[in-house]
Amino acid sequence: MRLFSFKGRRKKKSLFVQSEAEIPIKIMVAIGKRHAVGIAELGDQSATVEKTFLPFFKPPEPEEIAKMLLSKLGIPENEWEEILKNKTELQTNETFWR
């Protein structure tokens, strides 16, 4: 199993004050032998994605799952590249997953 993390910030205008605040975006993607799962959080919003693929197909790239999550959260496409370039692959204990 491979785990990936994406982090970014999104500027959002306050409803009551004439200022902008930066809200952190956190995305986690896990890709296994037959499933890919992703979860994203933006402030009080969250989104999940699950994708099943056949063993003889190429597994999806973590960026593909992250793009699906960003789309579900309503993030404009012009902000995606900045978030997707902050990818980190997390180390896993392979013996645990066997």
UniProtKB/Swiss-Prot annotation:
Protein name as it appears in the record: Uncharacterized protein 72
Organism: Sulfolobus islandicus filamentous virus (isolate Iceland/Hveragerdi)
Gene, per the UniProt record: SIFV0072
